[in-house]
Amino acid sequence: FAQDAQQAAAEAAKTITTAPVAEPMVEKPKYWTNSLKTQINIGQTSLTNWAAGGDNTVSMQGFVDANANYKKNELFWNNRLQLDYGFLYASSKPIFQKNADRIYLESKFGYKTEKMKNLYFSANYDFKSQFANGYEYKTPGVENIEDLPRKEQIQHWKDARELKSGFLAPAYTNLALGIDYTPTKWLTVNFAPVTGGFVIVRDEALRQSYSMALKKEYEGIPEAERPTDGSQLRNYRFELGAQLKLDVKVNVNDNFSYSSQVVLFSNYLDHPENLRVNWDNRFDWKLAKYFSFTLTTNLIYDDKVMIKSDKDIDKFPDGRQRVQFKETLAFGFTYTIASKKN
């Protein structure tokens, strides 16, 4: 009996020592980082017996900033989509006016060789346009318009408005080949000596304002005999040039952040000495978990965009080049899905 017990114990020990050992779990590499930020801003002004005058106003604006970035060894692929839309209603005009409208898509692919420190060969694609028509609302030349029925008031305001923009009118799309330089975490400099793209103006009425070229079939025809509604102009323009883009992203602390993008473009094919400038700034100040102040500024200069002004309409009836500037200060609800790897 003792011998059998010893044999059984030996066999059990042998079984235990030869049993497979479980290998430790190795976490798979995660290369994607995603983030989503949504914001809704609301503004309201109400005046009662206000001696200085003014309008009762209501405004609302929505903003989405989505990012999907891939990073593996020496390769990266960054994608960003920004959507911005807002409207304003003022008691002096019985219509809703658009006060914010932007579509911006950017995708950048980069690769770094072993000998390059903080330098990447890159290909950068971007697209910019807007969702809906934008108008300049001029006061209708109708006496006592406020005494008319509301439907008639709205129609008079619509008849007096002037179209300024629309979907794909204009739109800018570019592919830039060059080098990315990232000296710090908060600064990226992209220089692309080969940048090709198109300026698209779908609406015929806006083509002259964006200096679109004459269609071939109208070349050689006297100007007085050509159409004047914009149908005589092309709906796109090809551009080839060099682009310099600077991106800054700074988180000062948990409650305050700043981002900026400057884009300079020189067109080799037409007056390369004239730079097209786009400069966007955004300041975010977090007041509470879901509420924040936001200040945005947008500066644009494009020598191909002709802007009319009542101050010098007699001297420049077709408009002239001007610096465009927009500033928005807003308070609203903000919800952010923190960047995460998946």
Describe the residue ranges of each PLM region.
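Cleavable N-terminal export/targeting peptides
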Residues: F1-E27, A338-N342
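Transmembrane beta-strands of outer-membrane beta-barrel pores
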Residues: I40-S46, K72-E74, L83-Y89, Y125-Y135, ...
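Outer-membrane beta-barrel "beta-signal"
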Residues: V323-N342
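Outer-membrane pore/translocation modules
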Residues: K98-G241, D318
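Residues on the lipid-exposed face of transmembrane beta-strands in outer-membrane beta-barrel proteins
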Residues: L36, I40-I42, G62-Y70, L105-Y111, ...
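Repeated loop/turn-to-beta-strand initiation elements of outer-membrane beta-barrel proteins
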Residues: E74-W77, M116-Y120, W186-V189, N255-Y258, ...
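Residues that define the transmembrane beta-barrel architecture of outer-membrane proteins
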Residues: N56-G62, N99-L105, A169-T173, Y236-A242, ...
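Surface-exposed strand-loop-strand hairpins of Gram-negative outer-membrane beta-barrel proteins
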Residues: G43-F63, S91-I95
